[in-house]
């Protein structure tokens, strides 16, 4: 088995919670486009903010969030949505893990070959959208 599942939804909707529920029932491994972003800016964040972008608290993440959004957006725009995909693609495909490969942050369908298209058309993956219930 080598099924790839992408989870989409706004920040705080429960994408990682869905991963935790799935991984408790079947062999699953987590992947994230945002982890690639955090790896890329980690040295800068530690030097300028004293924050490890890969292992920060929720409060620290809110401090660096504008930088993450800005940098991530610039890279997406310059590559028509492919920059973070290309960063994660090799790791995902080369990983010999035999179970569900779950990408916990499929967010964009802005460009023709963006994250949703990549998941569905290139990886033959399944997309799950999580909505946060509010009263």
Segments (PLM) and residue ranges:
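ATP-dependent small-molecule kinase phosphotransfer cores
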Residues: 33-101
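P-loop (Walker A) phosphate-binding loop of NTP-binding proteins
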Residues: 10
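Extreme N-terminal starter segment of soluble prokaryotic enzymes
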Residues: 1-5
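Post-Walker A alpha-helix
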Residues: 18-19
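ATP-dependent NMP and nucleoside kinases share a basic, alpha-helical "lid"
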Residues: 25, 29, 87-135
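Sparse, context-dependent recognition of short Cys/His-centered cofactor- or disulfide-binding micro-motifs
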Residues: 7, 26, 53
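Conserved lysine of the Walker
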Residues: 15
